[in-house]
């Protein structure tokens, strides 16, 4: 029987800060990704330092990297790192029940007109996720604990429970359920642009990943058949996202020398 989720109340100042982030208009919302990548970098630093004295700490996932994966179908943007990750108590304490010393100071600064982009300097950058998401899940696996998932749609509380989904090995996966008016952040080109702008400041590879596709010319009839095949396979497709270099699109409609109308479709490979 699956473990019941435990519900926790956000510490009062954190709840106030989240309300301020959610209910105030900020123009430079993209800073959320810089903050989450920065947190991923810190987690990678921690496991790297710890492994210097105990190399076995890296065994569960040796590669040190961060990836951002937009998924238009699910309406999510996922940020994954192979850093030190969080135990259950880390999730409870660090993401809601114990206010960082900068929480109140940052709220006061915001109300005095400070820019939202300063959030990281106060140690509460994680909550910037709620600039563009109305629900956030944080799945994490630390070497010293089982895998747990934290979840909150704000509203004053969050849940934590044991997670039996795909094992991370070690690290953290943050899934942002993007608000309906923020779907720009599901565009791979937009994510790549922000990652390129901010990831130059971290010492690890930060990739934007997507399902890889290529253009293939087919006749209209073949295109219909391909579409049916693709729909039949969609539920069974469990391939990992792949890094994609975006190239130029070719003309969508062409005719071959027999006069048949050609269509360019996307083919997974």
From Swiss-Prot:
Keywords: ATP-binding, Chaperone, Cytoplasm, Nucleotide-binding, Stress response
Keyword ATP-binding recorded: yes
Gene Ontology terms: cellular component: cytoplasm
Tagged with keyword DNA-binding: no
GO molecular function: ATP binding; ATP hydrolysis activity; ATP-dependent protein folding chaperone; unfolded protein binding
Amino acids binding ATP: 39, 81, 100, 126
Pfam families in the record: HSP90
Residues covered by region (Disordered): 206-269
Principal location: cytoplasm
SUPFAM superfamilies: ATPase domain of HSP90 chaperone/DNA topoisomerase II/histidine kinase
Gene3D superfamilies: Histidine kinase-like ATPase, C-terminal domain
InterPro entries hit by this protein: HATPase_C_sf, Heat_shock_protein_90_CS, Hsp90_fam, Hsp90_N
Signal peptide region: none
Cellular localisation: Cytoplasm
Composition bias type Basic and acidic residues, residue spans: 209-218, 225-245
Biased composition (Basic residues): 260-269
Similarity section: Belongs to the heat shock protein 90 family.
Role played: Molecular chaperone that promotes the maturation, structural maintenance and proper regulation of specific target proteins involved for instance in cell cycle control and signal transduction. Undergoes a functional cycle that is linked to its ATPase activity. This cycle probably induces conformational changes in the client proteins, thereby causing their activation. Interacts dynamically with various co-chaperones that modulate its substrate recognition, ATPase cycle and chaperone function. Required for piRNA biogenesis by facilitating loading of piRNAs into PIWI proteins.
Subunit structure: Homodimer. Interacts with shu.
Protein name, per record: Heat shock protein 83
